[in-house]
Regions:
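N-terminal Rossmann-like FAD-binding beta1-loop-alpha1 element of flavoenzymes
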Residues: 7-31
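Residue-level detector of alpha-helix initiation sites
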Residues: 9, 13-14, 36, 126, ...
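Glycine-rich FAD pyrophosphate-binding loop
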Residues: 24-49
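An anion/pyrophosphate-binding glycine-rich loop and adjacent beta-alpha core
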Residues: 37, 210, 216-330
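Glycine-rich active-site loop/strand segments that organize a redox cofactor
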Residues: 50-81
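Short beta-strand to alpha-helix junction loop
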Residues: 75-86, 119-137, 148, 198-205, ...
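Conserved redox-cofactor binding core of oxidoreductases
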Residues: 93-174, 179, 186-187, 230-233
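Flavin (primarily FAD) binding-site architecture
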Residues: 185-198
Length: 334
């Protein structure tokens, strides 16, 4: 490892990899990650990625996004996200990402909460793993990128020009200052500070702590997304996500009486609040998710990861409902 790079990227999930792949190939880049390269939140994402299918869907897509964000979204950012989505998908496909296609080779679209139509591309129920692994493979081909696992950012190096690099702890535990013209943080998760989260435990908001120390302006630190459906367990550790696309394909939420109590495809904060309310009314530590409306072949074909994990936990989702509970999922401030 050298003492100076053109750019240091902290994190190697989708954001970090995408940054590395778009920087000039003559730039000397160091990427670091706190654990294994595959242990990013991006790797854990299940459901899929939304895309503008055609121009006629723009207005609905825009309104769905603004509504889900309680109209606090920056309109220009929403427009950029939607307008650029097809180009991003095309880039991902060019890098080898394999989205589900039908028998005619056309891309398949599923539905998730807060979307008024099917506009979600997916790879079974391990879309994050598919995207991140393919991006990582592309990054590892770049001769100008040095990727170091088990290497932790402990602080930034500040000087007269602002941020001038990072102080890292290497795999041997040594503190090493590394200087760079540009420092890119792609390490936004905070789930490790929660008892119940879908995130890896080591993802604990390190960047936020360092930002606060150096009086970096932060905003919306209370914008913490609670995912409505994780598999209930009394065991400690990371919570297993039950993808929203399961509800998009027809699964329903039930209370202890076997009654539906909410519209399952509302925005996540609304559905999570409805579940918490039902749990409080029934003095229960979970509600139930029934996949009975979904054909068994669809479950095993579209959701093989969820199907197998639930079997390991003693639940056959093709024959019985499963206990689910909300847990921390995304962090949208910073």
């Amino acid at each position: 490892m050298k003492k100076y790079y053109d750019a240091v990227i902290v994190g190697c999930g989708v954001a970090g990899c995408f940054a590395a792949l778009h920087l000039p190939q003559e730039a000397d880049i160091l990427m670091i990650t706190k654990a294994d390269t595959e242990d990013s939140d991006s790797f854990l994402a299940q459901g899929g990625i939304c895309v503008l299918k055609n121009e006629s869907d723009y207005d609905a897509f825009y309104e769905d996004t603004m509504h889900a964000g309680h109209y606090e979204n920056t309109p220009e950012s929403v427009d950029i996200m939607i307008r650029s989505s097809r180009n991003v998908i095309n880039q991902l496909i060019a890098w080898g990402v394999d989205f589900r296609r039908d028998e005619n080779g056309e891309l398949c679209y599923t539905k998730e909460g807060a979307h008024s139509t099917n506009r979600i591309l997916f790879h079974d129920d391990v879309t994050g793993k598919e995207i991140t692994s393919k991006l990582l493979a592309q990054v590892k081909k770049l001769p100008n990128v040095t990727l170091l696992a088990h290497t932790e950012m402990c602080d930034i190096l500040s000087g007269k020009n602002g941020c001038e690099g990072v102080l890292i702890r290497d795999e041997e535990g040594k503190l090493v200052p590394v200087y760079a013209r540009d420092v890119i943080w792609a390490c936004g998760g905070i789930g490790g500070i929660y008892d119940n989260s879908t995130n890896f435990p080591h993802i604990a908001g390190d960047g936020l702590g360092i930002a606060m120390k150096h009086q970096v302006v932060l905003e919306h630190l209370d914008y913490i997304q609670i995912h409505p459906t994780t598999l209930y367990s009394s065991k400690p550790g990371r919570r297993f996500l039950i993808s929203e696309s399961v509800r998009g394909e027809g699964a329903v939420l039930l209370n202890e009486k076997g009654e539906r109590f909410t519209d399952e495809l509302q925005p996540r904060d609304v559905v999570a609040a409805a579940i918490f309310n039902e749990m409080e009314k029934e003095n229960s530590n979970h509600v139930w998710l029934s996949l009975a409306p979904i054909d068994e072949a669809v479950i095993q074909n579209h959701f093989p990861n969820i199907y197998e994990h639930c079997l390991e936990e003693g639940y056959d989702v093709t024959k019985e409902p499963i206990p689910v509970v909300p847990a921390q999922h995304y962090f949208m401030g910073g």
